[in-house]
Swiss-Prot record:
InterPro entries: UPF0352, YejL_sf
Species lineage: Bacteria, Pseudomonadati, Pseudomonadota, Gammaproteobacteria, Pasteurellales
Annotated signal sequence range: none
Pfam family, one: DUF1414
Classification via NCBIfam families: PRK13689.1 (NF010242)
Organism expressing this protein natively: Actinobacillus pleuropneumoniae serotype 5b (strain L20)
Family the entry assigns: Belongs to the UPF0352 family.
Top-rank taxon, per record: Bacteria
Name of the protein: UPF0352 protein APL_0584
Amino acid sequence: MATQSKYQSKQFDALSGDLIAILEKHKAPVDLSLMALGNMVTNILLENVQTGAQRLALAEAFSNALKNSLKIK
């Protein structure tokens, strides 16, 4: 999703691969996968971001990045 990242590709690829493997292990359909991932994002924001305004700003940036990654090039 991100065009630039402060994380190494190796670290990102390993984490992404693990998350995908878990969804595949549970044979999670698309809707269940999206629900689980959405809950993870919500929990990450609630547990790690101090203020409601910061959480909303990050959620907006995240949703914009997601939408931009889906645009046909």
